[in-house]
Amino acid sequence: MTRFAKTLLTSSVALGALAATSPALAQATGDTAEEGGENAIIVTARRQSESLNEVPASVTVFTESTLRAAGIEKADDFAQLTPGVTIVTGTAEAGDTQINIRGINGARDAESSVALVVDGILKTNTAQLNQQQGTLRQIEILKGPQGALYGRNAAAGAIVIQTARPGDSLEGRVLVSAAEDNTYTANGYIATPVGDSAGLVVSGSYFHTDGFFFNRFLNDNVVDNQEVWSIDGRFVADIGPNTELDLKARYAKLDGASINFNASFHLPNFAGVDPDFFEDVNEHPFDYFSNIRPVNEQETVEFSALVRHDFEAMTLTAWGLYSDVDQLLIADGTSADFARFTFPAATPDSFAASISCFATTAELTGFPINSPTFIGNTPVPFIFDPVDGSTFGAYSPTTCDGTQLQIRNQRDFSAEVRLASNTDDSLQWQVGAYFLRIDRETGVSIGADLGQGVSRELFNPAGSFNPTSLLANDDFSTNVYAAFASIDWEVNDRFSVSVAGRYDIEDRSVSSLVPAAFDPFTGGPINPGQPVVNGVVQTLPDQSETFRQFQPKISLTYEVSDDMNVYANWGIGFKSGGFNNQGSAAIVDQNFNQFIGTNVLINDQFRKETSSAFEAGIKGSALNGAITFDLAAYHTTVDDMQFFEFFVGPFGLLRVVSNIDEVELYGAELNLTAEIVDGWTIYGSANVTESEIKANASRPITVGNESPYTADYTINVGTQFDLPVGDTIDFIARADYRITGPTWFHTVQDDPSPTLFSGLLPGSALMLPAAVGDADYSVTQRDEFGVLDVRIGLEIDDRFTVIAFAENLTDESYLNEVIPAIEFGGSFLSPGGLRRFGVEVAYDF
């Protein structure tokens, strides 16, 4: 454990003890949306309404008043206000979201580790994690395995969202805001009764920004620009004396940029030529100059129906959800330095690509790009032509990089039936069943850039304007069957026991959609995994597998006093295994294991992930709830943790999921809040997570390293004001400061590794030993950073609100994500948001 972590953990324990007696400290949960006795926050964390203080688990709650005060709209807003939770979203594309809770991360291209439940319905597509979900009323973030209660992919926790329901009278809200970088937001809702027993809510939102960054070559704001709009409808009706129908529909459309990354090198033996060949990722100056305009499109369609019927002693709930999310991205290629399109082969396409590559290089010789890369007189890699050659890096302004097109389209249908007790007895129970069908197509296509744009077809034959050179394209089908049950027993007035369990069966299959074709640039098959028999390319065979797991959970709660509870829980988390794009293992083996002897273990199928998690904690309050606190400690062992790997080489790029055999996680967490006077609240929280890779057959040298994407600690402090300054005017203000500790993003950390340059140098014009091309990844840890957000304004007559806001007020420079491409010899870096000032106006009616 680091010295800082030990100090913070010790301080947390001391603060927890102090909170029980001091009026200055308490838990950071925000204001109440639904209040019980003595202002208790009411939550549905266990699919039943109960006081937050009674829930035997760590739960962070954002109620309606807190959501408005903090300007929370999406997951990236509330994740930054939650201890032990970090998020990476929108770096590659809008639907690319990874949420990490206490060291368990949702690996890119695998399933999420966090369940998303909106108005009682489980959403299964990871692309929906950071979407707006309508008019928010309350958000609960549960930590630890929640699969027994909330369903699949809840190994790290669950996000439970409640949106606006129609009431007995007409109401609504309109909000507009304007900020720097041509950033505009508009959203609102209207809720109205329909007859005596029904009601309707319609919500809409719009967002536009030019983004923070600029493409110098294209002379346009096409790096992180985005335009999004959505409309949500909800119809709730009593269709019988004890029966309620809840219908929802949603449509959303996004257009923007993709692949907000720069490349950085970590080759220490080249630092004598240029120090930037061995660059600390935290010191990288971001600049953009690709010749291909990056594009990201996302379209979402959803329909759901939920029926709830109350019997005399039990409630039956049944729902169904149809979801269709299509995603596409277009961007520049990554591999000009490996000369895939540089030298002509015996095909017209290869000649055309080579001519374009040489011509654009000659035209752009000397054009300034990020050091240590440069555009020389020719596109020949400088290690083969030290006098006139080039070092492009990724996303250069020449056509030598090629192009990339990626799609991720998913349609799914899910349904659940749940029967739960509905009495005041000491024994409560629920039982149910769940079904899910997923049809998902993913594709990654690398094509030649002939200066004529990028095709939206994954496969473009030889002779086309954007001929395909490498293709991974698969259809994934999944059927999920699950049964679950739970029992909650109030043993006496102070002691309760809960037991829950869920059994999942996931049938998965994959079929390759890659045609049997040769690559016009390398002469091999369009997918290196395709066999060639008697000169004829063969299709990749179908694969299938079934994954099964029982997920038990046990929780204990003891009421020490009327104001203090202690609890403990243990549970098993589960994420199904699955398939990478077929041919991935062959690409890695041919380009890395056989060429430079890395012995990286990548399979076309990745294993299921399971975790065993234990948590114990204490929750308390004082002064009629004005002071609240909770302190928790946890330990988790993860077997076969799923981890995203990114490979770059002469083949282009490759995205795969691998497994880390065993990871140990443990830590502590503290939340404190105090209402100093009526209308003035202060709050704070801290999390420390220690992690260690215990076994990793995929990369054995990484044993002893930390869990990737896991911050060493997070600290949140803030204050909120709502004070009268006149008969009908209130002064409102909120400040939130979040510190995120050092973070590794890969299993390879303080480790050297051979790269493709190690294999190329001995045969190059430089004739250097292979070891000169080895990389050192000790410079890839993201540093600690802190972000301050401030909102100040007036509320008039409880209806009209004017707020000035600043995001990242101190203009802190930080990294959103680091993706080391180990055998490439560098990393792909995505920047965090810069400072932005704006004004927001809202009207309630």
Predicted regions and their residues:
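N-terminal Sec signal peptide and the immediately downstream disordered periplasmic leader
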Residues: M1-A70, D76-T82, P241, F303, ...
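Gram-negative outer-membrane beta-barrel transporters
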Residues: T32, D493-R494, T628-V638, V656-V748
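Extracytoplasmic beta-strand/coil segments of soluble accessory domains associated
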Residues: T44, D76, Q80-I121
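Outer-membrane beta-barrel translocator/receptor signature
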Residues: D96, S112-S113, N125, G134-R137, ...
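Solvent-exposed loop segments that connect transmembrane elements
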Residues: F212-V222, I259-N291, T334-L405, S445-N473, ...
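Structural signature of Gram-negative outer-membrane beta-barrels, strongest in the C-terminal barrel
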Residues: V236-G240, L419-N422, Q428, G432-L436, ...
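Membrane-embedded beta-barrel scaffold of Gram-negative outer-membrane proteins
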Residues: S304-G333, E559, N565-G571, Q582-G583, ...
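C-terminal beta-signal and adjacent terminal beta-strands/loops
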Residues: R738-F757, G793-F845
